C-alpha cells in the first residue's frame, strides 16, 4: 500500500526512478519481459517483448540521438533459450537504467509511455490529462456532459500544484497544466470513481489517496464513490454553487462530508443562527444544495451536520447503519427521504421531524409498528417492503393519510395472510381506488370487494347503534340470509339448520372473509327503525305501475327488505325511496359467493340435500320416461287433455320442496302452450339421453355424488310463467340441482345462508336438451325436456364460462351435437361480437366501431312523481319533490306502453360503450323447439341507445342519508335526459364496476356533456323566488330569448353556403327557432325581455387553504352576466352565486378531477368551429386541468345526439326539481394545442386537435382577454413536467441541463408547456386594410388608409313586435382617418387550424357598410334599450357612398333591419360597444377626426 507523500516546501527532492527487469515469461512463440518500475513508494509492473524495446530504441535514436549500440543485439537462432533470456534480462535492465539516467529531468514521451508513466507517475498522468483536455475540453464543456476522473489523477494534479514547477516543463504546449486548471474552473458536472484494492498493476491504493477539489470553481453536481472522505479536501469551496452531491462507499459519518472542519473545532454553529454559547467556529451553509445522496456508506447516525443543508429536498441515506431517525427537523424543505436498508426499529414521533415529506422509503429495516406514520399527511409514496410487520392493524396507521397513493408491503409477515391485498386496501376506506399496492394496479374485483365491505361495515355500525341491549349474543353471531318479503299467503319454508355451520371460503375473485354481524347487516336495508317497528309490506302486483296518489299511506312507504331508506319517528323529513316493491326486487347477496366447490363442509351439506331429493326423485324420473315412451304415438288429442297430461308429467319429473300454495302460485298463471308434434329424431334423442342418465347403478349414484361446480346466480325460470329468484346451481356428475336463496322474512332474523337454502328441483344431464348463451358472457340458457322449461342463468362472465365448460365436459362428444342450439351462442362468441351483430341489426351508424366497456343486469325503475303521495304540506317545494317514493312502472323507449306492464319486473342489461348507454331487453318467453329456427333471431332483443353525455348520477340523492348495505351495494339513481331512473343491480360488485367504468367514460368524452347545477335551497324568499307567482322553470324558460339565427337583409344574390342545422320543433320550453342560411346571417343575440337579477345568497365559509380569499373575491366580482348577453335560468342561477358558493358549484357540478382547482371565471359569448353561425352565452371556468364552458340551453339541439321522446321530454319531475340541467363543454388543457389572439385583444380562440375542440371566446373587451390569457399561462406553467423523485435510468446529471423556456418568434410564443400563443401580425392588419380598400368606391386611396380603431361590437336592429329591445348583430367596427366601416368577421375559422384541409367557404372579412367621417352629422348617446348605445347619424350624401362596388342595401324596409330616416336624407347606425373603454375611445377618436375634417366640434346629443 502506497503512503501519501508529504506536502509543503520542506519536502525532500524527488527520488530517482528505477526500472528493473524482474523476470520473463513465454507467450505463444515469443518471450515477454516483466519490468518493475519504482517511483518513490509507488511501484508497478510493465510487460514488453524484445521487439517493443527495439521500436523504442529506434525512436530514441531518431529523436534524442542516443547511442545505437546501447540496446542488446537481436538474435535469430535460439532466441527463446533460457541462457539467452536470462542474459538479455540483465542487458535490458542496464539499458533501461542508462535511459533513465540520461534523462533525469523530463522523461521523453516515448519512454514515458513505454514505462506507463502516463498511468502511474505524477508527471505522466498530468501530461496525459492536460493533452486530453486540450483536445476535447471545450467540446465537453459545451455539451454539458459529466466528466469522469479518478482519484489518482486528482492526486497527481494536487501534487503537481504543490511542487511549484513550471506548468509546462516538457516544452510541449499540449501538456501544459493550465489546460487542466482552465477546464476545472468551468466544469459543472464531476464524477470521481475510485477502485477497491490496488490500482492496475501497481501497489497504489487509489481510494486512500488525498486530493483537493478546490480547483473546481463552478461545480453544480458531484458524484464520489470508493474514496476516503477523510482525505478529500476542498469540496466545501463549491458550497455556493453545488446543487447535487453524491458520496457512496466513502464515508463513515455525515460530518466527514458536510463539515470536514469539525475535526479541527470542538464547538461550531451554522452561519445565520443565533449563538447561545461560546463557539470556536461559524460554518457557512451549503447555500444551493438540494439533493444529497449518502447511500452505501457506514453512517450510523444522522448528526447535527444536517443544520448546514437547510435547502435539501432529496435525501438518500439508504444502505447504512442508522438506528434512529434524528435531527431531520432542521430540513424544512425535505420532500423525498430514503432510509431503506438500515437498522430502524421504531418510528415514534416521526411526524415531528418530517414536515412536508412526500416520498418515504423505509424498506429493509426492522419495523414492526407503523404508529409513527399516522400524521404524515403530505405523504404520497411509502415503501415498507422487507420489514417485520405482522398485524393488519398496523396498516390502519397509514390508511387515513389523505394523499397516500403508492404503498409497498411486500416480504412482510402480513403479506402471506389470505386476501392480503383486499384487506390492506380496505384500510384506506373511500380512497381505496386511489391507492396502488405493491406496484400492482388494483383490479376491479378487488375494488368492488372493498366497496361492498365498506357498505357492510357501515351497515354494521348503524345496526350496532340500533340493536336491542337485551338481544342475545348468540343471535348476533349468526349469518343472515338474503332479505325477502313474500305475500302474506305464502309463509316461508326454511330447511332445518345444520349442527355445524361451515364458514365461507375465499373464491378466486378475491372475496374477503367478513364478520358475521356485518353479513347480517348487509342483507337488510338500514334505516332508523328497529326490527320490531317495521311493518311487513303488502303483496305487490306483477306490474310496477304507479300507486294512485290517495293510496300510498306513509306506513306503506316505510323501509321494507328490498327497499332503501325510510321514514322514522325521529326524522324530521322523509327519505327517498328507490325500490318499487319488495316482492319484485330480487338480487344476489354478496355474502353467499364465498361458498364454492372447494369448501368441504358446504359440499357435504349440499350432497346431503341432493341425496335426499334423489331418493324421492328417481322413481319419478323413470315413471316420466315410461310415460313419454307410451305416449309417443298418441297424437291429435283434445287441447285440455294434452294440458292435463303435460301438467302431470311436469309434476312427476320435478321434485320441489316448499309450501303447497307457493307451488300453486308458481304452477298457475298463464296457460300452457300446446305441445308441438314430436318428431322421430327427438324421440330417439330422448331415449339415448335417458339411457345415459340412468345407466349407473341407483345405489352407487346415491352414495357417490360428486359435486363439480357451484354457481351462485340470478335465475329466471320459465315454466309457462316467469319466476325469478337468487339461486345456487350445483353441477354434479349425474345432473344439476337448483337451490333458491329465500328472502329474509323479518329483519330480526339472521339465518345462515346454508340453513336458508331451499331445494327447488333437480334433473339429470339426460333431461338437458339444449344449452348455450343467450347473450355471450352474460346469460346462460339451459333448456330442459320440453321447451316450456327453460333456465336463464345470469352471473358474472368468469363463473358462467367455467360452469359452461364444466357442463360440456359432462357430455361425450357425440352428445354435444344434439345439445347445440341454432338460436344460442357458444362459448367462443364474445360480447363484442354480439354487440356488433345487435347494432348491425338495428342499423346503427358506426356500430362496427363500438366497443363494449361493460354490461350489467339491472332492474330499471323510472318515476313520474306526480302520481305519488308527497310529504306534509309544510315542506318547501324542493323538499317535497325529493321526498316522494319512486314507485312507478319500468318504462323505456325500447318497449311499447303495452309491454311495460308485462315486462316490468324483468331485468334489463345496461351496456356501456365509449359514447352511449345501451339498454338491452331480452325476450325470456319460452324458447322454441330445436329445428324451428335456422338462425339467431335478433328480434328477441330490443335496444335503446342514450348518449352517455346525457347520463348523470341523480343529484337528488343525498350522500348523507343512511341507506343500508342493499342500497349501497345494489341501488344507483341516474338522470337520463330529463328522466329519473333507478337501476337496481342484481349481482354483487356490479354497481361499483359500473360506476368505475361510467366515470372513466364520462371523463374521456370530448363533446358537450350534461351537468347538473343545484339550485339554492330555501323558500320563496330565496333567489328562485324572485320570479313572480312561483311559476315553474318551464314557463320561465319560455320567456328567455334563445340564441337563434336570423337572416340579414340582402338585395343582391350571394352564393349559398352550408345551411344551418334544421331547427327543432317548438317545445314547451321555448319558442320556435327561425331557420336561416349560415352564410347570409350571423347569430343574433336577442336579449331577455325583462332582465331579473336574483339576490346573491349569503357567502359560505371558505376552506382554510383553497380557495384563497383573493380567489373568492375575484370570482365574485367577475361573476356578472353582461347585460347584452341572453341568459337561461341555469346561467342566471350561476351568476347569482357569490363567495365560496361559486367554488362549491364548480367542484360539485362541473369539475371532473377531484384535485383540480378553479383559477378564473369569465362571462363571454362563444362560437364553436362546428356551428360558426351560432353565438351563445357561456360561463367560462378555467381550472388547473381544463377550461369549462357552461353554455346556454339553446346549444343543446345543435350538438347533442337527439334523444327519443321518452327521454328528452321535460316532465313535472324536472320542472319541480331542485336543480337545473345545463350543457357544459370541456377542453382539457392537455388537449390544448394553440391559442390565437384576435386583433386588439377583442377575442381569442382555443384550438385542440379536432374540430370539436375549437372554440372562440368573443369577449369584445381587451381587459377580459388579457386577464384570461394571463391566468391561462400561469396554469399552463404549473402543468410542466416535474422531474421524477425516483431515480431513473438516465444520466446522473441530465436533470440539470437547459430547461425549455418560452420564446417569441414571428408573433408566436411557444409556451414552456408546448402550447403555441399566436398574436396578430402586421400582415393581418395589411390584409384587413386591403379588404376594406378593395370594396371602396375609390380604391386608389387605399395606400392612404390607416386604421385608428378596431373594435368588435353589435349593431342594434329594429325591435320585433311586442319587444322593447332590438336584436344585436355582431359586427366589427373599423375607424380609419377618414372613413368608418362595419364588417362581418369570421373569428372561428381564421387563422386556419392545423387539421383544416381546405379554406373555409366564408371570407374572413365581409364589408357590410362604410361611411365617410365627414358625412357624420351628429352622435346620439344615452340610456336607450342598451346602456350607452351610440347612434351615429350620417347625411346620406349622393355620389359619396363608399360602397360603390357593393350592391347590398342594408337600409331597406325589411323588418328587423336598420331603417332610413324620413325623406331619406339621413342614415342611422345604432351601435352597441360592450367595453366601456372601447366606447370612450371610439367617441374621442371619432370626435378628433371629425373636427380635423370639418373644422368644428362633433355634435354629441344625450338622449333619455
From Swiss-Prot:
Residues 11-121 form the PX domain. The modification Phosphothreonine is found at residue 1282. SMART domains: LRR_SD22, PX. Residues 120-695 are annotated as: Necessary for homooligomerization and targeting to endosomes. Isoform 1, isoform 3 and isoform 4 are expressed in brain. Isoform 1 is expressed in endocrine tissues. Residues 660-869 are annotated as: Interaction with LIMK. Residues 635-649, 661-685 have a biased composition (Acidic residues). Residues 1063-1078 have a biased composition (Low complexity). Pfam families: PX. Residues 245-869 are annotated as: Interaction with PAK1. The modification N-acetylalanine is found at residue 2. Residues 463-501, 524-547, 554-573, 628-687, 1016-1104 are annotated as: Disordered. Keywords: Acetylation, Apoptosis, Cell membrane, Coiled coil, Cytoplasm, Endosome, Leucine-rich repeat, Membrane, Phosphoprotein, Receptor, Repeat. SUPFAM superfamilies: Outer arm dynein light chain 1, PX domain. Residues 634-695 form a coiled coil. The modification Phosphoserine is found at residues 541, 543, 546, 1022, 1284. GO terms for molecular function: identical protein binding; integrin binding; phosphatidylinositol binding. Both the presence of the PX domain and the coiled coil region are necessary for its endosomal targeting. Homooligomer. Interacts with GRB2. Interacts with PIK3R1; probably associates with the PI3-kinase complex. Interacts with IRS4. Found in a complex with ITGA5 and PAK1. Found in a complex with LIMK1 and PAK1. Interacts with ITGA5 (via cytoplasmic domain); this interaction is direct. Interacts with PAK1 (via kinase domain); this interaction is direct and is increased upon activation of PAK1. Interacts with LIMK1 (via PDZ and kinase domain); this interaction is direct. Interacts with LIMK2; this interaction depends on LIMK2 activity. Interacts with RAC1 (activated state). Acts either as the functional imidazoline-1 receptor (I1R) candidate or as a membrane-associated mediator of the I1R signaling. Binds numerous imidazoline ligands that induces initiation of cell-signaling cascades triggering to cell survival, growth and migration. Its activation by the agonist rilmenidine induces an increase in phosphorylation of mitogen-activated protein kinases MAPK1 and MAPK3 in rostral ventrolateral medulla (RVLM) neurons that exhibited rilmenidine-evoked hypotension. This is Nischarin. It comes from Homo sapiens. The lineage of its organism: Eukaryota, Metazoa, Chordata, Craniata, Vertebrata. The gene is NISCH.
